[in-house]
UniProtKB/Swiss-Prot annotation:
Protein name: Bifunctional protein GlmU
Free-text comment on the cofactor: Binds 1 Mg(2+) ion per subunit.
Catalytic activities: alpha-D-glucosamine 1-phosphate + acetyl-CoA = N-acetyl-alpha-D-glucosamine 1-phosphate + CoA + H(+); N-acetyl-alpha-D-glucosamine 1-phosphate + UTP + H(+) = UDP-N-acetyl-alpha-D-glucosamine + diphosphate
Native source species: Helicobacter acinonychis (strain Sheeba)
Region of interest: Linker: 227-247
Annotated localization: Cytoplasm
Length: 433
């Protein structure tokens, strides 16, 4: 077994946001949560190093992960990646296991499989990337597949900057190695910080083996600005789309479809172009038509759209919800709502038809109220149901009706102003003075 230390103490100033960098999301999930999931997939001892907005990050983490060990970096005394794992006396933080994997919190694309080459090493090891454009990364100087030196870009000379082998920001150390060399770290560099990479110099001077393990670039993309966040999100989206299609989901123009990590699919599903699925959603044996938005909802044995919007807590089963229909906190069972309706805070029974322009008026300016509609109900176009109201089963509501009172089962309900036809009314209205 091994312990995992995740470095998350930085300010993330290049994000230009009051939100901590690691809480910025990819596909609906904070970046930090991805790396924590990976950490717990390989270890039962996960440590998180915090400083900037640490209480905010800790609160978010504890809502999802209960086994994290939190530490506060002593930034005022020990800044930098090396300082992050130091205690007051410069010894490494306490861990359960002798092998320690160190990861950066701003690398949300790392997976267990991507780390496998590094974890197979029996020595101290550093993950490397070979980049065509290594700008922004620390350079790694190798000799016989062993690390001889790591130079941060800020401290590199022109010859060192030409090297394409760069530090991936992933380290595997034995605890005894850290105990021996961490107290020797100093901050005599351009940034006045303690660098983890400097540990290699101490080890090399005493003939310690430090393996250079090349890793796949896609999995170790660091996120330091909004442009990099967007790039990482597109990679994550490609993974989610592929996973869905591997389950048999049909996607029309996949690159136009957005879905988040909490979306799950069952049975035969079709997603047309421009569909957006966000939050925790279940899509089961469903056809989501073009440019529809589904949020925190369940769509089962149903068709939705095009241009429909299922807002949170919508459960649509054995139903058809057509174009420009919006639902919110709605339960539809065997319902047809073809077009241009708002169905909020309602329950609608089987074999009910909702005409065009029907609105459940759920808000009175102070509180939300519920509309209950039974089975075998026909609601004519352009009707308003003013909640709270209950419509029984086998009810017919005429077009243009405003319902303010409960309707018993078996009734016909109408509320219309009588129509008046005035002979020659057109000519009288437009008569010239």
């Amino acid at each position: 077994m091994l312990s995992v230390i995740i470095l998350a103490a930085g300010k993330g100033t290049r994000m230009h946001s009051s939100l901590p960098k690691t809480l910025h999301t990819l596909c609906g999930e904070p970046m930090l949560f991805y790396i924590l999931e990976t950490a717990f997939s390989i270890s039962n001892d996960v440590h998180l190093i915090l400083h900037h907005q640490q209480e905010r990050i800790k609160e978010a983490v504890l809502e999802r992960f209960k086994g994290v060990v939190f530490h506060t970096q002593i930034v005022e005394k020990y800044s930098g990646t090396g300082g992050a794992i130091m205690q007051e006396d410069k010894t490494p933080i306490l861990t359960k296991h002798e092998r320690i994997l160190i990861l950066n919190a701003d690398m949300p694309l790392i997976t267990k499989d991507a780390l496998t080459p590094l974890l197979k090493s029996h020595n101290n090891a550093i993950g490397l990337l070979h980049l065509a454009d290594p700008k922004g990364y620390g350079r790694v100087i190798l000799e016989n597949h062993q690390v001889r030196k790591i130079v941060e870009e800020k401290d590199a000379n022109d010859e060192e900057k030409a090297i394409k082998s760069v530090n991936a920001g992933v380290y595997l150390f034995e605890r005894k190695f850290l105990e021996k060399y961490l107290p020797k770290l100093h901050n005599q560099n351009a940034q006045k910080e303690y660098y983890l990479t400097d540990l290699t110099a101490f080890g090399i001077n005493e003939n310690e083996k430090i393996d250079a393990i090349f890793l796949e670039e896609e999995f170790f993309l660091g996120v330091n600005c909004q442009t990099e966040r967007a790039k990482a999100e597109e990679i994550m989206l490609e993974r989610l789309r592929k996973n869905a299609m591997d389950l048999g989901v049909v996607m029309q123009l996949p690159k136009s479809i957005y879905l988040e990590k909490g979306v799950s699919f069952k049975g035969e599903c079709v997603l047309e172009q421009g569909v957006r699925l966000s939050g925790t959603c279940l899509i089961e044996n469903a056809h989501i038509k073009a440019y529809s938005v589904i949020e925190e909802s369940q769509i089962v044995n149903s068709s939705v759209g095009p241009f429909a919007h299922a807002r949170p807590k919508s459960t649509i089963c054995d139903s058809h919800v057509g174009n420009f229909v919006e639902t919110k906190n709605a339960k539809l069972q065997g319902t047809k709502a073809g077009h241009l309706s708002y169905l909020g805070d309602c329950e609608i029974g089987k074999n009910t038809n909702v005409g065009a322009g029907v609105i459940t008026c759920n808000y009175d300016g102070k509180k939300k109220h519920q509309t209950i509609i039974g089975e075998n109900v026909f609601i004519g176009s352009d009707s308003q149901l003013v909640a709270p109201v209950t419509i029984g089963s086998n009810v017919l509501i005429g077009s243009g009706t405003t319902i303010t009172k409960d309707i018993p089962s078996g009734f016909l309900s109408l509320s219309r102003t009588p129509q008046t036809n005035i002979e020659n009314g057109y000519f009288k209205f437009f008569k010239k003075s």
